[in-house]
């Protein structure tokens, strides 16, 4: 999968490109262990008999369908030579819409695929699903923002343990880097070192927004993000 460079996507393209490389690496590792977890709709092929209709309000039908097939003891293969071309989001506001919708669909999938949370039944597939997807969409965003006040409490209550203070400094620097990266991005200023904390926080904030999006939108339709 690639995005169309010819339309001047700039920072948005780079963010999506780096994130996609990371996701592709995870999918490759998942496949080498047992099975890829989920599939991108534009790069997804299955045997016709394995296809099944998803509920009309499903937000991530490609993800849901691929995992339902994997739950039948089929393998989702990862092919690193498959190639698709699409334009990236026009700007970070449009990318935010996309991330919120994906997060909402992910949370919806966690509820609808709750039987996959049983490792006694699904073994390695269950472990991969929880570690790669469920934690990302449910636990990580909440834990991320609880860590800061909890770290402050540890510093206050454990004066004799400077390691907690060091962790607090590192965490503060990471968050401040994300905020500064956001300000630079708004001014179209590039800084690859601040990209990581900025995009990491950007994604996790949008997971929380995705939760409220899911509560407000009962249907499976959404406002499509503008492409560059």
Q: Where are the language model's segments positioned?
A:
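Alpha-helical bilayer-embedded segments of polytopic membrane proteins, i.e.
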Residues: 125-184, 195-206
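Juxtamembrane C-terminal module of membrane proteins
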Residues: 93-94, 115-125, 172-228
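Short coil/turn segments at secondary-structure boundaries
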Residues: 37-40, 112-113, 118, 145
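A residue-level structural signature of the nucleotidyltransferase/glycosyltransferase Rossmann-like core
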Residues: 36, 42-43, 75-76
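Single conserved hydrophobic/aromatic residue that forms the stacking wall/gate
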Residues: 2-13
């Amino acid at each position: 999968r690639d995005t169309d460079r010819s339309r001047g996507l700039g920072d948005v393209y780079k963010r999506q490109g780096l994130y996609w490389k990371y996701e592709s690496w995870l999918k490759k590792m998942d496949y080498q262990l047992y099975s890829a977890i989920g599939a991108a709709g534009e790069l997804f092929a299955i045997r016709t008999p394995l296809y099944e209709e998803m509920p009309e309000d499903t937000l991530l039908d490609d993800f849901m369908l691929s995992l339902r097939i994997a739950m039948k003891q089929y393998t989702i293969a990862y092919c690193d030579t498959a190639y698709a071309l699409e334009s990236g989001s026009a700007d970070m506001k449009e990318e935010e819409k996309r991330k919120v919708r994906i997060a909402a669909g992910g949370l919806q999938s966690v509820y609808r695929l709750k039987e996959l949370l049983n490792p006694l039944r699904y073994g390695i597939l269950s472990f991969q699903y929880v570690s790669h997807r469920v934690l990302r969409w449910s636990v990580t965003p909440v834990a991320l923002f609880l860590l800061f006040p909890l770290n402050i409490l540890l510093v206050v209550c454990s004066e004799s343990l400077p390691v907690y203070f060091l962790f607090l400094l590192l965490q503060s620097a990471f968050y401040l880097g994300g905020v500064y990266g956001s300000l630079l991005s708004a001014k179209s200023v590039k800084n690859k070192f601040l990209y990581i904390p900025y995009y990491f926080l950007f994604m996790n904030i949008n997971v929380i927004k995705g939760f409220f999006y899911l509560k407000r939108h009962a249907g499976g339709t959404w406002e499509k993000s503008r492409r560059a």
